[in-house]
């Protein structure tokens, strides 16, 4: 059995390196590191603010992290003796929703999740946790669902060696197991 922990379980003052070391010290086998957009990209008044996780900003892997940054984190985890099992984050939820109808936001969302997938490969993680966007007042449910399904499929094709896990959260869609199974 592998027992892991998500980076968000640690204090906001911990950067990703602190969280990796603390996870090992606390006896965890693995850690899910979190990913976000580069500073200044998040919208005001969104879920990031409501959950008060904005203080984590720039303590996470982000869209500006280089392959060298990610490789350095991999080396730290290896030297610490802990596995990075997955990469997760809210970048595809409220920052750049996968369901965005605006072409620029949609491109940023796809690019961000591709960066998560590429980072997972460098880290030796086999899973990326993605939130499939969100439903807003100006969207029809089926249109948002179709966009999410199409974009998740394209992302899965980008990195077939990485599992793409879809997280069901308070995003206004995927209310039942039936929807998740389609």
Which positions does each model-derived feature cover?
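Structural motif corresponding to alpha-helix initiation and N-cap regions
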Residues: 13-17, 66-71, 174-177
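Catalytic domains of carbohydrate-active enzymes, especially glycoside hydrolases
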Residues: 17-39, 123-126
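Conserved Rossmann-like nucleotide-binding pocket used by diverse enzymes
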Residues: 4-6, 31, 165
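Active-site acidic/histidine proton-transfer and metal-coordination neighborhood
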Residues: 78-86, 92-182
């Amino acid at each position: 059995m592998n027992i892991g922990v998500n980076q968000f379980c640690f204090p906001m003052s911990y950067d990703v390196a602190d969280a990796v070391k603390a996870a090992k010290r606390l006896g965890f086998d693995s850690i899910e590191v979190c990913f976000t957009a580069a500073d200044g990209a998040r919208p005001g008044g969104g879920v990031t603010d409501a959950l008060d996780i904005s203080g984590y900003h720039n303590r996470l892997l982000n869209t500006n992290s280089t392959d060298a940054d990610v490789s350095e984190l991999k080396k730290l985890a290896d030297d610490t003796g802990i596995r990075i099992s997955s990469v997760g984050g809210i970048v595809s939820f409220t920052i750049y929703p996968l369901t965005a109808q605006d072409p620029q936001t949609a491109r940023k969302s796809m690019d961000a999740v591709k960066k998560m997938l590429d980072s997972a490969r460098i880290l030796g993680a086999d899973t990326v946790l993605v939130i499939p966007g969100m439903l807003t007042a100006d969207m029809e449910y089926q249109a948002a669902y179709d966009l999410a399904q199409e974009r998740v499929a394209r992302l899965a094709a980008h990195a077939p060696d990485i599992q793409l896990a879809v997280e069901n959260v308070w995003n206004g869609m995927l209310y039942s197991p039936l929807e998740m199974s389609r």
